[in-house]
């Protein structure tokens, strides 16, 4: 009898483990984008020097701003080409790597030439900054050139699937590569042309297989700035994504004021189906950084989006069957001015002003129980120091800038993070070297902690812990509770931009140079 009970208990434990051990195929939890995972049995600490709790380590480039995602036995992350894995890919490139989840072996990579007509369109050495979204055997990504690509999860090793077959030309540097012009000089977006000698890089088994490609510059009319930073949201047959439309190299001019900030593509073909119609682009202070989220509010599905103009929007998703050849306009449900007292006209004259400027939003809007949690404020490089964490009532409609605010909590200085909302608590880190825990219901501060370094990553809650890396290379693990408790502080010696990801009882931590798989 005791053996039978033990067997049943063991079976129950295995089932429970299987329930919480799962892939993490996109940035943030499900559609809500909350930085919270149901994973269990995760390590509290690790040590790369001694190997404690280290499952494997993979070498990356020298700049890694992309967060790892895990799906179907593979780990995906973007980096640069300063540590090339294939000698045919030389020089500055954006690189997107696919590793074996079991052992960290490189399975394939997408290596894309940088834009050359203007350094501010594809910043040198920045690499591939966007985070992938995976569904089945397809990987969706915005690459460093500002193109949305759909990739075969198995790479070219199983053949070149279509309809896109021109990988050789896409991996080869264009002939019209030129030095970056002086600020203010008129430049035009380059197109990819074969080199004059006709020699194309021949892709091999280690290269990516592009299934389709949508060029945001040529086909959506955007002007990219600094780097494409996006995380594609999948809803049914559609892809929702921010375009990275921004200022030019003067930081005082929008070259594409009529371009969309939020678009919808067909996930099977890459065809443009819909865009926003809110004139967002003309008032973008720096760039369109924030990816969209989605939730059901009172039985109604909504797309939430933070524009580069500092406005938080809710849109209705488009219908299942979009009209052929007609780009729809997304229907707005509400708008919320995140910083109503900020300048609204001639906004770029405030560029570089640390006391007064518009606000923008880098992190994603997080939906939990009819409320949106958004962090934003003055731009890290060009704006004022002020920043806030705000809670918005997502059940309202129209202009809810006044009546939609539930609470506002001041942060120390600038903010790049997406909030993590767990068990009635909100965790957020800012660039003023402070980590915050506040009440989700009213924004009441519970505790703060002085940390070493600015934070570009987001806090990540899993297994009763909060994981957080900083730009100084320090890595923290806090207890996810109302009373402050620091469980671990490590010095990883290399800056961290990426958010931690938990999947299948493993946490994945990316520094600028290495990807660690950590298992208890």
Task: Please provide the spans of the model-predicted regions.
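Positively charged n-region of N-terminal signal peptides that target proteins for export
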Residues: 1-7, 520
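Bacterial N-terminal signal peptides
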Residues: 6-17
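Noncatalytic, solvent-exposed loop/strand surfaces
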Residues: 19-520
């Amino acid at each position: 009898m005791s053996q039978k009970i033990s067997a049943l208990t063991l079976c129950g434990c295995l089932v429970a483990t299987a329930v919480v051990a799962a892939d993490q195929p996109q940035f943030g939890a499900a559609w809500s984008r909350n930085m919270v995972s149901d994973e269990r049995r995760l390590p509290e600490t690790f040590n790369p020097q001694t190997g404690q709790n280290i499952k494997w380590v993979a070498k990356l480039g020298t700049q890694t701003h992309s967060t790892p995602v895990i799906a179907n036995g593979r780990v995906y992350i973007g980096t640069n080409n300063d540590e090339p894995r294939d000698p045919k890919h030389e020089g500055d490139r954006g690189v997107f790597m696919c590793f074996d989840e079991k052992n960290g072996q490189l399975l394939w990579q997408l290596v894309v030439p940088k834009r050359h007509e203007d350094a501010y369109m594809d910043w040198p050495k920045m690499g591939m900054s966007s985070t992938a979204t995976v569904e089945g055997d397809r990987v969706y990504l915005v690459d460093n050139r500002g193109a949305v690509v759909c990739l075969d999860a198995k790479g070219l090793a199983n053949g070149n699937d279509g309809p896109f077959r021109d990988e050789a030309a896409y991996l080869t540097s264009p002939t019209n590569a030129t030095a970056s012009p002086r600020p203010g000089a008129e430049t035009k977006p380059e197109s990819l042309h074969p080199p004059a000698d006709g020699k194309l890089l021949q892709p091999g088994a280690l290269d990516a297989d592009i299934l389709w490609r949508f060029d945001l510059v040529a086909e959506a009319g955007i002007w990219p700035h600094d780097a494409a930073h996006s995380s594609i949201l999948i809803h049914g047959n559609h892809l929702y994504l921010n375009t990275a439309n921004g200022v030019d190299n003067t930081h005082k001019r929008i070259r594409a004021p009529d371009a969309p900030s939020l678009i919808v593509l067909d996930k099977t073909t890459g065809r443009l189906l819909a865009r926003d119609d809110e004139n967002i682009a003309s008032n973008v202070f720096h760039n369109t950084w924030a990816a969209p989220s989605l939730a059901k509010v009172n039985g109604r599905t909504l797309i939430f989006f933070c524009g580069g103009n500092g406005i938080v929007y809710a849109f209705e998703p488009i219908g299942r069957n979009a009209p052929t050849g007609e780009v729809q306009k997304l229907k707005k449900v509400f708008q919320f001015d995140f910083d109503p007292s900020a300048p609204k006209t001639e906004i770029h004259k405030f560029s570089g002003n640390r006391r007064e400027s518009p606000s923008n939003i880098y992190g994603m809007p997080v939906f939990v129980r009819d409320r949106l949690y958004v962090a934003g404020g003055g731009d890290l490089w060009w704006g004022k120091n002020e920043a806030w964490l705000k809670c918005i009532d997502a059940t309202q409609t129209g202009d809810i800038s006044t009546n939609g605010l539930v609470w506002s909590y001041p942060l120390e200085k600038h903010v790049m993070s997406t909030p993590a909302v767990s068990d009635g608590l909100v965790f957020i880190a800012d660039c003023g070297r402070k980590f915050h825990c506040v009440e989700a219901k009213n924004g009441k501060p519970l505790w703060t902690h002085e940390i070493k370094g600015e934070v570009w990553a987001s806090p990540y809650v899993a297994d009763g812990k909060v994981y957080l890396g900083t730009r100084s290379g320090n890595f923290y693990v806090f207890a996810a509770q109302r009373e402050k408790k620091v469980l671990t502080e490590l010095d990883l010696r290399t800056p961290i931009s990426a958010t931690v990801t938990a999947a299948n009882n493993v946490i994945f931590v990316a520094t600028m140079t290495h990807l660690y798989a950590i298992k208890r």
